[in-house]
Every structure is written in C-alpha cells, then in structure tokens.
Amino acid sequence: MTSSAVLNQHLIDPEICIRCNTCEASCPVGAITHDSNNYVVDAAKCNFCMACVPPCPTGSIDNWRTVPIVRAYSLEAQLGWEELPVELTADELSAGQSLANDASDGSPAQVATTAAGVSTPQAVSAPPNYGALCAPWSAAVPQVNVYGPSANDPDKTIATATVTGNVRVTQVGKQNDTHHLVLDFGTVPFPVLEGQSIGIIAPGLDAKGKPHHARQYSIASPRNGERAGYNNASLTIKRVLEDHEGNPVLGLASNFMCDLKVGETVQVIGPFGSSFLMPNHPHSNIVMICTGTGSAPMRAMTEWRRREQKAGRFEGGKLLLFFGARTQAELPYFGPLQSLPKEFIDIEFAYSREPGLSKRYVQDALRDRSADIGKLLNDPNTYFYVCGLKAMEEGVLLALKDIAEEVGLVWDEIGAHLKKDNRLHLETY
C-alpha cells in the first residue's frame, strides 16, 4: 500500500472535549469548527501545524486515525459523533486503497477533498500567531485533569462542590446578570491556580439521553481560596439569555449556576489549563485586558498579587487593568475595583454604550496609554493577558502593534519575542 493514499487524520475526542473553543481559536488556518454538539477538524484544511495541540486543556485535540484518504471522516460525520471511531483494520485500509485508485488519479489532494465533500482548498496564508503556548518561566506548576474523563485515577471522574455564596456583581435591574459564585470542595482536594478553569456539569440529560457536556468557567479566586486558607474557589458567570445572533435562548449551565442557592451542590471536573498562568518572580509586571466575564482570571491574579504583597512576600511589579463593558452597570465587580489603591493597580475602564460618553473600547484605552504600554512591551518582565470575547482579540493586537511602532519598535520582532518568551497570553471565546 502506498502512503500517498493514506491519511493520518486529525480528530477531536467528543467524550473528553469540554467545548472550550481553545482549539478553534488557536487554529491559524480555520480547519476547526463546531456546532452545538461537537468540535471537528476539516481534513481538507488541516495542515498538521499542531498549533492547536499544546493549548488544549484536556488533550481531546490530540487524536489521530489512519484512514484511506477517500474515506476521510467528513465534517457531517464528526458532528454526529458521541465517541471516536475505532481504528481501521489492515484489511479495511487495503480496501480503501483500492477505492482510492478507482476513484481518482491518485492525487492525495484530490481524494482528500473529495472525501471531505469540499472543493480543492486554496493556499491559506496563516496570520501570525503571537499568543504564548506555555506559561511564564516563573509560574507555579499547575495540576490538570485531576477529575474528569482524562483523570489518571479512575475513581476521580467527578468532584462534588457545595455552593457557599452566590451574589450578583452587575447592577440589579439591568439585563446583564452576572454572578459571583463560591464553591467549597470540603475535604476533596481540588488544587487550582489563577488562570485555570473548571468544568461544570449541569444536571439532567440532553436530547439524546446522555449527560450534558461540561461547561468551562475560569477561576476567579487565588490559589489559596476565595477565602485564604479554605478549600474553595469562585467563578464569574453571566446568565445567557440570547445566542450570538441575538435570538432568545436560555443557556443551560449559566442559568443553572446563576440560580443556585447556598447549600446546593454541583458536579465539577478539571482543573484545566497550563499556559494562561501568572508570573511569580519579583518585579514582574502584569497587563490585563478583558471584557465581561473575561475578568475572572484577572480578579484571581490581582487578588493573589495583593495577598502576596500584603504578606511581604512579593517585591515590586506593576498591575495594569484595561476593563471593557457596554456600560458601567454591566461591568462586573465595579464597586470592589474602585476600592483598590491606585498605587497597587492602575485601572482603565472602557465603555462602548455608556449614555453621554463617546464609544470607547479596550483597544482605545490601550492607545490612550501608549507611552506606558510601549515601555512595557519592551520590558522582558512584563506579561500581557487578554481574556473575553473573540471579537476583541484582533483590535487588541492591532493596538499593541500601533503602540509598538509609535514608540519606535518593530512589531514583528516584538511580537516574536512576546511569543518566544511566553509574555502574551490570549484566551478568547
């Protein structure tokens, strides 16, 4: 059998995937897409660059099946999967070889695109990807997949946490309903770091009679707990009332979580994430850029740094926060943020729909502080974190590029250093 008719097809395991969108956001050629059921890889577009593999929090992206090219699994087939298909036998591969010879002139490109049901793809120029794939050198070592399908211990499939707090953190009476929830794990070890996330499994079954897929939420508390020394963690969750097109819909997990009462329990898996972690070395600076519930990891990092400085265990280092929302009323944690000392954290709010004010986005706020940001871009001890809706990512990167050039830096060189030194972290969805 000639290798030209065989494809080592890149696939995503639907049983392990937590639908966090990390793979789709990381793919530079648009080969990964999704529907309400699964995330899938287009065999006709995937160029095996592997950019999606390191950021995946669960390892569900790192799966492969050897198939005859004419039998490459289509997007339609993958979207309907509940588990990965078994490996083909040698006889099945041989039979596929015969089909390949009969169906085409033997061109791998032709049979691959025929199998995937698309026309021959045009060459795709991948845009530069400046996001870090690893944590800062001084970050704490994370534990991942302690609970869930990927757990090393088969007895640790799910952890149970008890709700000990649930408070709204956006203005009451407004449509944007965001909650701060505190989950207590009791005697169950559940180690998390700032920048990691967990998966929440909503109760009940889906339309197919299967347990619901876990929904991913970023940790909003420091590593030693929402209350220092306690085995608890907090989340920032917005109640989903409409889909991306603006159509009315009740988000399953978000509404379940926002409606929880103190004393009720939830099923948790994780933790996930090994790269979106904060630096811990003295004099390290952190620039945080976020919108909405993207503030969760920023709150965690800020509180850990505050506790460390208060205890005299951290020396120097700047904290800058660029926080965007449509209005002040929709901005989570507005009150507590106002009470933080200005010498501890430098905060810029950006409102795009505040009555009486001009539209201002986080990228505008960055440009307004170009002198400060320009210096920090060139400082090897400064780390940038971007978290929020995917739509903000391009605007933020363009702003950083403009600022770099404004202060006489070459963006391609600075961008390459940011990536190599793991100084620019992107977590958008």
Model regions and ranges:
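Short, compositionally biased
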Residues: 75-78, 209-227, 278-291
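Active-site beta-strand/loop microenvironment that shapes enzyme catalytic pockets
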Residues: 282, 286-307, 392
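Cysteine-centered iron-sulfur cluster-binding motifs in ferredoxin-type domains/subunits
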Residues: 9-30, 40-59
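Reductase modules of NAD(P)H-dependent flavoproteins
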Residues: 124, 132-133, 140, 147-148, ...
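Short, charged beta-turn/beta-strand-edge "cap" motif at the junction between a beta-strand
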Residues: 204-207, 270-275
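Ferredoxin-reductase
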Residues: 148-153, 160-261
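Flanking helices and flexible, charged tails adjoining ferredoxin-like Fe-S electron-transfer domains
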Residues: 1-9, 45-130
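A short, basic/flexible loop-to-alpha-helix module at the beginning of a structural domain
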Residues: 2-7, 272-281
